[in-house]
Amino acid sequence: MAPPVKGKRKQSEEGEPLDPPVSPQPDGEPRSRSPVRLEEPPEAGREREEEQEEEQAFLVSLYKFMKERHTPIERVPHLGFKQINLWKIYKAVEKLGAYELVTGRRLWKNVYDELGGSPGSTSAATCTRRHYERLVLPYVRHLKGEDDKPLPPSKPRKQYKMAKEPRGDDGATERPKKVKEEKRVDQLMPAKTKTDAPDPARLPSQETPRDGMEQRGPAAGPSLPFLGASGCPEAYKRLLSSFYCRGTHGIMSPLAKKKLLAQVSKAEALQCQEEGCRHGAGGEPQAPPAAPPLESPQSPGGPAEDSRHRLTPLEGRQAPGGGLWGETQAGPRPSAPVVTGCFHAYPSEVLKPISQRPRDLFPSLKDRVLLGPPAKEEGLPAKEPPLVWGGDAGRPSAFHKGSSRKGSLYPKPKACWVSPMTKVPAESPVPLPTFPSSPGLGHKRSLAEDSSVHGSKKLRAVSPFLKEANAQECGTKPRGPDLAVSCLLGPALPEAYRGTLLRCPLNFAGTLGPLKGQATLPFSPLVIPAFPAHLLATTAPSPMTAGLMHLPPASFDSALCHRLCPASSPWHVPPATAYTAPHFSFHLNTKL
């Protein structure tokens, strides 16, 4: 152990002279540099001391001035995650050329970089400028002997935003602009009132030909208020367009646009009120008389029929026929007055326009047996006061085109267009056309079918549904004394009158259910003969005409559920009758 120690000492002793030549180089450098370092600190220290003294004096005077100004600096804000050094920001701005130059050249981001803020900040320049303006700028202007003048515009790059002005000039700059805008609106408003003033006077003369072309009726009165009301939006659009054209504002800020629109809307509201008063004075007195002309031609029965429009749902459905008859008298007319004047909609029913004239031709029918409405209407009141039906038999209705006579007395599900049937050639043995019908309607028979079975021998053993129809419709549905169901409408008919009951749907309301969603087919003139009113009236002493229903030539909605076949015998004139009584053969369960 000892020898190696001695050896190490020897090596260290021998190595001692070798160390100095190696060590002087690193030692010499610090020795040569040390005098420089020792010389610099006094100068840097003096500068630092001077800067610190100047900074302290600046901060003391700054705080004192701001306190005297009644805007004391209570807390120095942070900028870029660092507290702002007011001395540094002051020196940086002075180095770049004072506040006005930095603002004009947009160098506030450079000031922020010198303060050592984070480089990724997007609002660095704006925040730096605001802090400088609030904390340092008043004192800097005090040092330079400048007055505390208002600040320059905050965002000179975006000058189109007129509403946002510097804080000091907000009130002073916006007031003249508002005055100018109000002057423009005032200049435009008299012009618009001058141009719009003669409009109410022109409306009756100019717009009546248009209404005459469109309506051809007495409905020109109510159109005036609508035209007057629509005049205001047009004037508003014209005013806005002319305002923007004459204003020449260029690009406007949203706030300025809102202010402009508010001013224009106020002025236009006043104008619209004035125009409304004028239109109300000119057009509204004409509107109330226009309502009676719309209802008067549509209700030929007079006040008695108008009062019946609102008695019961059943009677309400019977009312529209009168209105439809009146519609053809006054000429074509818009659909809105017709709907509001006549039709009464019920939630569970289909709107059914009808013709009511058979009551006029056969007054004895109201004392006879009437077939009632379908089963779903059993709960409805069944009172039927005597009707006052107006009109003559020669006037067609809107729904029965070309027919010289109205249809049945009872409600039908739909209205369909029917070709004329009044004039049937006496020598026409042409077979009847066949109509397609859905197989699902086979078991839905009307009472006309059953009554025709009782009246004619050919139909007795044909249909397999006769017992079912008799049991359901004839035997099990009593509806009261006035609406008693009967399969035979009178005594047994002589042979000459059997053809008169052919396929006549005596209970049209019975077919409401199956025919609600289906289209109806028009009849050919050869299907059912239309007996003139005077011929049937001449046979009134006979028991048959008192119990017969009038054969309606109009649209038979029960046509879809009937199976019609060609006629088996031509028309002939029996010796005992004064009019033709056709005989038809029907095969009821034939599927077409």
Curated annotation (Swiss-Prot):
Residues 1-53, 143-225, 277-333 are annotated as: Disordered. Phosphorylated by MAPK14 on serine residues involving a TLR4 signaling pathway upon lipopolysaccharide (LPS) stimulation leading to its ubiquitination and proteasomal degradation. GO terms for cellular component: nucleus. The keyword Ubl conjugation applies. Gene3D superfamilies: ARID DNA-binding domain (1.10.150.60). It is found in: Nucleus. Disulfide bonds: none annotated. Residues 52-144 form the ARID domain. PROSITE patterns: ARID. Residues 28-49, 162-186 have a biased composition (Basic and acidic residues). The modification Phosphoserine is found at residues 23, 253, 438, 463. GO terms for molecular function: mRNA 3'-UTR AU-rich region binding; transcription cis-regulatory region binding. This is AT-rich interactive domain-containing protein 5A. It comes from Bos taurus (Bovine).
